[in-house]
């Protein structure tokens, strides 16, 4: 294959074996990211300032943005996009707490917090303005910017009126609680 070539202001992280991190080609982590022992990085990208704790899997083509915080034993499935935040200074990082499962092609950005052991099904997109609707009770409960612990979440939509008519808008639906395992 030949040497890996790049040009950047910041070098890439090195010495993965000594750090106790399993890194599969072509995974990349920028210097200034923290990756704990026991993390597995499939071909993926981890930006400066990101923090990833032990036992976490960053699967193929997943990206962990600058300053994002990923807890212990998290699974970031293939193609997941975790947003970063280097600026503006007052912006909050995305936080994925311990034991979460983030399904394939999910996007979590803008300082959203996913609490302990929550599960996001494939293709869930959550921003600060995304309605997260708990539909497990008689009356729905709405959240924004936070997914409660152990929630099981799938993509959904709701109808919204606009001047030009009614249209479906994406949301995230809490459809249950993660079972004990």
How would you describe each model-predicted region?
Residues 21-161, 174:
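Structural signal for interior beta-strand "rungs" in well-ordered beta-sheet cores
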